[in-house]
Amino acid sequence: AVAREGFGMDVHIFDPYLAPDKVPSGMTLHPSLESLLGLADYISVSVPLTASTRGLIGAAQFACCKKTAVLINSARGGVVDEAALYAALAEGRLFGAACDVFEQEPPTAENPLFSLPRFIGSLHIGANTEEALIRVGRTVASDVLAVLNGREPRFPYGQ
């Protein structure tokens, strides 16, 4: 929503578990990941690493992307197949990519992605700021108090 309002973007999403009536206002839900990838200028990956999401974005998915698309992976290492990402970038099938998560963390200087001019890599440290740690502590404490007082927590485990 922030991107849509701040940058004038159309926001399209794919979520196999999201009911159509629960789609946030102003967003378009796609029936498949591939249909979304074929339209996207910027692809932001935001999923946990599970058995079903490991390698979620691989060679077949990159084949669906526009050659002008940019991939942003700040989810978890292993969700994007790095060998397939390297091939897509090196062969010009994807314009660019930025990742702050890698299959091997921390990434080594020998990671071939770092040799590509249209790849930006950084460490996944966004949650390690003092402000983020304080916010997490407050959120956990608030949810514990909610449960102790017979209310639903704001962030129940597993949801």
PLM ranges: what are they?
Residues 68-159:
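Rossmann-like dinucleotide-binding domain for NAD(H)/NADP(H)
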